[in-house]
Amino acid sequence: MADHMNTTQIEVGPGATNDTINFGAGILECYERLSWQRALDYPGQDRLNRLKRKLESRIKTHNKSEPEGTRMSLEERKAIGVKMMKVLLFMNPSAGIEGFEPYCMKNSSNSNCPNYNWTDYPPTPGRCLDDIEEEPEDVDDPTEIVLRDMNNKDARQKIKEEVNTQKEGKFRLTIKRDIRNVLSLRVLVNGTFLKHPNGYKTLSTLHRLNAYDQSGRLVAKLVATDDLTVEDEEDGHRILNSLFERLNEGHSKPIRAAETAVGVLSQFGQEHRLSPEEGDN
């Protein structure tokens, strides 16, 4: 594979492995630029870090099978990957890559190929990622739990009883928490859980989470990656805890609804351990 990083023409070559690695590096570059703009949420940051580790490992392994003169670093592959995106998105063969031609350019009659130019659809002026406010999707017979003036121990027990009546599959859970002298918070959660033969349930995916203050204003949201799916259960718990820690900042007392919401999801996996402060409540 020729290395001409100082020109506009870069040979990608016919190998699908190189194409895949280079394109992944381009995706990583996009994630990093989003991160610089502070436009990535917690699962996005996790995805960035995991993708970088996987690419570094795969490049190291792949380079062992390449002649020394053709080995490329992650940064070099990022440049190629970004140009590959230009070819794919804008169907522009002059984007600067030789040896890489999109399938749709060679098979324009294929019904799965787009027949429009993406440049015809510029982004809407004045809108950015933070402006997007979507409610978690509706599901049949959603669970709604109202917890008013209830201590955390009783609240968790009520939640556990309510949630355990749910069937396998997707669920929507609304938690309304209102305690004297504590900021009220409404938490909407979408997720999917699996029921095992022994009756034990585990959270398999977390699709999205919105948190609203007492005036109905969206104060935090979590949209998971990969078709709205957190990749594993541990990630989901860690992301939620981090999210709610941010909500707690700046308040003299913890937001009990936040702790309650984390407790709900913890019923589908690892045991939720009470802090010393909570143990007496």
UniProtKB/Swiss-Prot annotation:
GO biological process, one term: symbiont-mediated suppression of host type I interferon-mediated signaling pathway
One Gene Ontology term of the molecular function aspect: RNA binding
SUPFAM superfamilies with a match to the protein in the record: S15/NS1 RNA-binding domain
Highest taxon in the source lineage: Viruses
InterPro entries reported for this sequence: NS1 (IPR004208), uS15_NS1_RNA-bd_sf (IPR009068)
Keywords: Host cytoplasm, Host nucleus, Host-virus interaction, Inhibition of host innate immune response by virus, Inhibition of host interferon signaling pathway by virus, Inhibition of host ISG15 by virus, Inhibition of host PKR by virus, Interferon antiviral system evasion, RNA-binding, Viral immunoevasion
Region (G1P2-binding): 1-103
Role this protein plays: Binds and inhibits the conjugation of the ubiquitin-like G1P2/ISG15 protein to its target proteins. Since G1P2/ISG15 is an early antiviral protein, NS1 may inhibit the host antiviral response. Prevents EIF2AK2/PKR activation, either by binding double strand RNA or by interacting directly with EIF2AK2/PKR. Also binds poly(A) and U6 snRNA.
Protein name: Non-structural protein 1
Record organism: Influenza B virus (strain B/HT/1984)
Protein's gene: NS
